[in-house]
């Protein structure tokens, strides 16, 4: 990966890092027959995907913990001092700490000594009116979610990217710990949108993408985020910024996750993944459509727990913000084919900002019955009919 950065530049490097991280999320635990800590590693899996692919992934995170200069300095010192030797996690940690002067126990505990992944989710961002402190102060409320591990990451450096209404971006950095965290950032730009880890410096249990739209297009397969988006309408001369985060962790309201308010018909919501859609686009004049594909045909697929037996009660759940209840999304239809093969597509005709998750439930519970006493009499003609009918 570092060679690619030197050869082709930062953007190509980050693309390679993301490609590798997506492979790790999708395939490493399948090829290696489970989720494993990098140390100790079972003998049978020492030369597997975890050692090589996830190893590269977490070393990228070490660079984010240390910064470029200290990472380079420390790496060179450790290699020079330990060349030709064998190191376990304890001696490697001591070597890096001696070379950098930084306490790296949080990194080793999070990325080396336990399996799985962590992902940080932005629950809310509130910007105060500028006062005595120069710039805009934004208070962030964050949640850390886990996949296939037990311990939350501590002292984790995290980029916070803000965009103003003109689409300019500015990056600040915070250090956060635990399941829930609050932090503040001060920026010169007035935030119109805020995102975590948009610069790709930290590999997590999530994939993300932000991109600009300036013209209509058919459905496009977006890299990394398992989503197709198209643009049906956009005003001439306008542009829109779209950001997609695909989190490989349970949605709020799933068993073991943060409790969430849900419509009465929601029986279960995905405990494996969900999306956050955000962006800078006008409320009028832009129409995006999307396709969310669910896959539950076998136990290795993310939606097996929801749809492995049947898709009969499948629906697309959505909430505008984490403070809102999960409800059935208003503008979609389901294309399932067979209801018993675990696979299908939620076809969204109008994409909105918010969080999306796959769910099960009898959505007819949310449909209020007609009040027969206050319902006007209606006539349908002709009867019988062949091509059309009239309702009066």
Residue ranges of predicted features:
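Residue-level detector of functionally pivotal "anchor" positions at catalytic/ligand-binding pockets or at interdomain
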Residues: 359-381
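Hydrophobic alpha-helical and helix-loop surface patches within well-folded domains
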Residues: 1-141, 148-149
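Surface-exposed loop/edge segments in extracytoplasmic proteins
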Residues: 166-174, 323-332
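Surface beta-strand/loop "capping" patches
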Residues: 110-152, 211-236, 373-376
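C-terminal beta-strand-rich structural cap/linker in extracellular carbohydrate-active enzymes
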Residues: 185-207, 342-364
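Surface-exposed beta-strand/loop patches in extracellular or lumenal glycoproteins
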Residues: 90, 140-161, 283-308
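Beta-strand-rich binding/interaction modules
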Residues: 118-195, 392
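Self-processing/autoproteolytic domain segments and adjacent N-terminal interaction modules in large
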Residues: 214-328, 352-363
């Amino acid at each position: 990966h570092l060679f690619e950065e030197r050869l082709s530049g930062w953007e190509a490097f980050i693309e390679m890092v993301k490609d590798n991280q997506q492979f790790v999320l999708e395939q490493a635990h399948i090829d290696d027959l489970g989720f494993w800590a990098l140390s100790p590693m079972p003998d049978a899996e020492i030369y597997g995907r975890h050692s090589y692919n996830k190893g590269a992934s977490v070393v990228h995170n070490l660079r984010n913990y240390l910064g470029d200069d200290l990472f380079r300095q420390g790496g060179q010192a450790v290699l020079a001092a330990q060349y030709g030797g064998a190191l376990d996690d304890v001696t490697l940690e001591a070597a890096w700490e001696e070379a950098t002067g930084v306490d790296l126990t949080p990194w080793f505990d999070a990325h080396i000594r336990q399996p799985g992944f962590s992902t940080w989710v932005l629950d809310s961002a509130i910007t105060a009116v500028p006062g005595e402190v120069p710039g805009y102060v934004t208070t962030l409320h964050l949640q850390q979610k886990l996949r296939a591990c037990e311990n939350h990451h501590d002292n984790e450096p995290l980029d916070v990217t803000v965009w103003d209404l003109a689409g300019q971006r500015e990056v600040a950095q915070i250090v956060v710990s635990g399941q829930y965290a609050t932090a503040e950032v001060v920026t010169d730009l007035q935030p119109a949108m805020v995102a975590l880890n948009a610069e790709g410096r930290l590999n997590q249990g999530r994939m993300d993408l932000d991109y600009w739209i300036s013209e209509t297009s058919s459905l496009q397969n977006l890299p990394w985020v398992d989503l197709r988006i198209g643009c049906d309408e956009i005003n001439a001369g306008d542009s829109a910024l779209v950001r997609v985060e695909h989190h490989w962790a349970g949605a709020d309201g799933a068993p073991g996750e943060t409790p969430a308010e849900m419509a009465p018909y929601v029986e279960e919501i995905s405990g494996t993944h969900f999306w956050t859609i955000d962006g800078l686009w006008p409320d009028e004049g832009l129409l995006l459509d999307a396709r969310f594909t669910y896959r539950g045909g076998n136990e290795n697929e993310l939606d097996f727990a929801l749809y492995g037996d049947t898709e009969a009660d499948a629906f697309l759940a959505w909430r505008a913000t984490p403070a809102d209840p999960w409800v059935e999304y208003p503008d979609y239809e389901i294309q399932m084919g067979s209801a018993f093969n675990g696979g299908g597509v939620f076809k969204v005709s109008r994409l909105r900002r918010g969080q999306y998750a796959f769910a099960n439930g009898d959505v007819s519970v949310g449909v209020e019955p007609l009040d027969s006493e206050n319902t006007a009499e209606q006539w349908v003609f002709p009867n019988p009919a062949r091509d059309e009918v009239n309702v009066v």
